[in-house]
């Protein structure tokens, strides 16, 4: 461990020289650029809510709030709305998407020298979350986290974000409560850490004991779309459903992105 990460404490480590990360935002922008270069008719539409999916013999039509799009083949990779769009398309789906927010901290400039690579703990197979880790980003920033807390809004990136519909759907689904009851202590600890920088730091110190309160600052948050079974089981692999002219990516676990 010390050879690669002098500030990390641990019993043993596995060095993986081929690991890496990607900037998904830049990758997506590049894909759009390439598509438009291949075909000038390629179009990117943002902010258009999908109201319905109309079935046809040879093609399907996506009905948006202001526009319609007809295509022989549709690919839905909708993340936090994947289950709802699948049902609009007529997919018979028992599982439901539940959102879990992950908060990150960043290392301050004075502490960045303490992380040289990507540092991960040994994951606990009893939980669907990896645990806090250190990630050196493509822009040189270093993220620490995330935690994992149930969010009361599917796109709830803020700690106090709330949606009646999303909360009702999640809390009236039996699988949600089975997940809660089987991971009660874990869930409570995660919520405590979400509102306490000191507790978050204590977890980070499990890997790098020399970190102090001055070494970390609040960073971004993300929401994981967790496909949850009726038995409370988390689906830890890809779930792709083929339905007529459509392909639905219902579950895209880490390190996937939507």
Labelled PLM ranges:
Residues 2, 94-97, 215:
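A short alpha-helix-loop-beta-strand transition element characteristic
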Residues 2, 43-45, 217:
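General small-molecule cofactor/ligand-binding pocket signal
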Residues 170-258:
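C-terminal catalytic lobe of FAD-dependent flavoproteins
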């Amino acid at each position: 461990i010390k050879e690669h990460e002098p500030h990390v404490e641990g019993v043993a480590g596995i060095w993986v020289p081929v690991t890496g990360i990607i900037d998904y935002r830049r990758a997506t922008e590049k894909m759009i650029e390439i598509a438009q270069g291949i075909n000038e008719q390629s179009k990117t539409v943002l902010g258009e809510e999908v109201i319905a999916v109309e079935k046809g013999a040879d093609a399907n039509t996506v009905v948006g709030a202001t526009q319609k799009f007809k295509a022989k083949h549709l690919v839905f990779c909708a993340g936090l709305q994947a289950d709802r769009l699948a049902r609009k398309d007529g997919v018979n789906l028992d599982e439901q998407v539940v959102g879990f927010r992950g908060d990150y901290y960043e290392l301050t400039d004075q502490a960045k020298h303490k992380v040289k690579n990507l540092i991960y703990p040994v994951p606990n197979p009893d939980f669907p979350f990896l645990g806090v880790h250190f990630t050196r980003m493509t822009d040189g920033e270093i993220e620490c986290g995330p935690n994992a807390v149930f969010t009361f809004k599917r796109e709830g990136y803020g700690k106090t974000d709330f949606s009646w519909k999303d909360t009702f759907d999640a809390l009236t689904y039996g699988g949600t409560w089975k997940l809660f009851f089987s991971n009660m202590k874990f869930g409570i600890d995660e919520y405590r850490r979400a509102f306490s920088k000191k507790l978050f730091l204590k977890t980070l110190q499990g890997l790098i004991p020399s970190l102090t309160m001055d070494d970390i600052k609040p960073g971004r948050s993300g929401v994981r779309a967790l496909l949850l079974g009726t038995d409370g089981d988390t689906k830890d692999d890809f779930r792709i459903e083929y339905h007529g002219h459509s392909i639905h990516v219902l579950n895209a676990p880490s390190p996937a992105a939507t």
